[in-house]
């Protein structure tokens, strides 16, 4: 495989409260000898605080686009990346530029679920958005596919908001 099913830098890049002791997760992993990077040695080019990081997708104080992109990275990009296990063409990593994601206003190459003029994400039109449909169901075609039996209702609300916030393309 050309990828690893696991956590990524942007997912782990945050401070955490360890029973009253606030510390950066990377520095804790370093102290436990689980990673070999020496963040404070002066040779590492970027300290953890300077690296990109996800936001909490359920924190409504954060920008809706950042929340949606963070959710996609944590729940979908594990397969939907270049050379990933998903056989669609999208790249849902948080660091991928929006115009390179192959997601917005792109027709699905697989199931359309009976949605007329379906798009993976139809800007401004949640009802034509296959991704929203997939996260709204728990049956064949659901996303995420693994380890989930319940619909993530806050995520469905988030993606509806995000899709509505996207500008519809000009009519041709």
Give residue spans per PLM region.
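Sequence context surrounding c-type heme c attachment/ligation sites in exported
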Residues: 1-172
